[in-house]
C-alpha cells in the first residue's frame, strides 16, 4: 500500500522495469539486471517467498542463509527490496499494476516445477507487457551440452570433458551499475517470512558465516590464493583450505559461475597446478 494516489501517478511518468529475484541474490554479473539497466531508467527489485505452489521445502539451514541473504540484499538496495509472500502470479500482478511496470525480467531456475510455473507466468503476463528471462546460474544452458544422441549427460566426467574442455567458453561476466527505484511501498519484512525457528544452531551459522555477495568474492579470492595448491588431495578434508566453502553462495546466486570461471582462469595457482 502506498500513501497517496499522487505518489502512484509519479511512478507512471517513469520508465520502470521489474526484476524478480529468485536464486540470483546479487547485483554483480546478473544478466537480468544488466539487461534492464541498459533499457530502463529505474528498476524495481522484488523477492517472493513462494509458499503456495507444491514445491520441495527449503531445508532449515538453507532457510537461515536465505534470511540473512535477503537482509543483505535489501541493504545493497538501500532498503528498496520489495519482499512478498504467497502466489507469484498474484503478487507480481499487484506490483506491475501499482508501479505501471513496462517489463518484467528474471533469471531462470531449472527445477522442473519452477520451469512449469515460470512458463505459465510468462504466458500470463505476455499479453500485457514484455517478459524476459536469462541464464544467470549456469555456464551453459542444459540443452547446449548433450551426448551425440541428443540426450543429457548423467555422469559428470563425460559432461566435464565435452562441456568444460570442448565447448565454447561461457560468456564473459558483466558488471554494470544498477539504478533501483527509491520507493515507499509497504511490503513484508524479511522477519515476517518466518524463515528462522529460534534454534540455537541457527545462531552458529550466522556467527560463523558471512552471508552476502561481497563476502562470496572474498571467499573466492582466498580459495584461489590458498586452496588450489594440493587441491587434488586436500579437497577430501573439509578442515583444509582446499575446500572452497562457496557452495551456499553459489546455491543462492550470490556469485555467478561466470565470475568464478574467469577469475580462476586468471589465477596463477590454477595455471601452476594444471587444474
Regions found by a protein language model. Name each.
Residues 1-11:
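Short, Lys/Arg-enriched N-terminal segments with co-localized hydrophobic residues
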Residues 1-3, 23, 101, 253:
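Generic secretory/membrane-interface signal
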Residues 10-168:
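Trp/Phe/Arg-rich N-terminal binding region typifying the photolyase-homology
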Residues 152-275:
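Glycine/tryptophan-enriched, flexible segments
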